[in-house]
């Protein structure tokens, strides 16, 4: 079993969504997501950001995670929701007939170890001019402390948005970024 998948299968058992809702809404506003946009929530965990995406788009939102336990938790958190579609998938292997306007990675990006593969897959499933939003609800410094002690097969140290965006330059332009004491954000636009 993939080490990341195994880690999150175990972590899901005690995982609680306790993010700052006002920060989530701010990040979504900054991302530019609007009504009728098709959004894929990648590495959704138990779905902390998914209902807020739906509040903006008013179209069903698909959310994927590599962990079956996380997806089960998301379905428990949002029962009987036809608007929030939670499915277990490895993003690198994800295939869909739908092309998305936005891919959002919220609190998940450090666990995607192959950024070049991430960039290629994002290019494949985004519409022309689609956007890749990479965000974390804590600063890069806090994230580094949070992930201290994690195996490098599970998480990686992320650089500044400028440094990280270089891996995406074949397919994307860095449109907007933030790296402050509150949150981390990269918005990349597909060329």
Language model features: what each stretch is:
Residues 117-128:
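A short glycine-rich, Lys/Arg-flanked "PGG" loop and its adjoining helix->strand segment in the class I
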